[in-house]
């Protein structure tokens, strides 16, 4: 349980510190999602409930689809702007 909380905090820290690079922001969001999935799996195993394991598989599937869509948008953004860095004004 502490490991998943630690991973979630690493994801938040990565998201906050890398606000100019979209790829690192996407990776940080994925780390946060996978840490929550890991927490659900640990809770499911401790309560001996298979529903949590099914829900974890669903979360991993949605996270994969989210990554694919995000990277597709990122490719379109790169073609439009020529760079993937975010510039705040």
Swiss-Prot record:
It is found in: Mitochondrion membrane. InterPro entries: NADH_UbQ_OxRdtase_chain4L/K (IPR001133), NUOK/Mnh_C1-like (IPR039428). The keyword S-adenosyl-L-methionine does not apply. Keywords: Electron transport, Membrane, Mitochondrion, NAD, Respiratory chain, Translocase, Transmembrane, Transmembrane helix, Transport, Ubiquinone. Its EC number is 7.1.1.2. GO terms for molecular function: NADH dehydrogenase (ubiquinone) activity. It is a multi-pass membrane protein. One of its GO terms (cellular component) is mitochondrial membrane. One of its GO terms (biological process) is ATP synthesis coupled electron transport. It catalyses: a ubiquinone + NADH + 5 H(+)(in) = a ubiquinol + NAD(+) + 4 H(+)(out). The chain crosses the membrane at residues 1-21, 22-42, 55-75. Core subunit of the mitochondrial membrane respiratory chain NADH dehydrogenase (Complex I) that is believed to belong to the minimal assembly required for catalysis. Complex I functions in the transfer of electrons from NADH to the respiratory chain. The immediate electron acceptor for the enzyme is believed to be ubiquinone. Belongs to the complex I subunit 4L family. This is NADH-ubiquinone oxidoreductase chain 4L. It comes from Aspergillus tubingensis. The gene is nd4L.
């Amino acid at each position: 349980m502490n490991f998943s909380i630690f991973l979630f905090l690493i994801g938040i820290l990565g998201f906050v510190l890398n606000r100019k690079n979209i790829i690192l922001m996407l990776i940080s969001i994925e780390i946060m999602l996978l840490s929550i999935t890991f927490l659900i799996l640990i809770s499911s195993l401790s309560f001996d409930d298979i529903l949590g394991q099914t829900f974890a598989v669903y979360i991993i599937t949605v996270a994969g689809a989210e990554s694919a869509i995000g990277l597709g948008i990122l490719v379109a953004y790169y073609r439009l702007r020529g760079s993937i860095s975010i510039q705040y004004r």
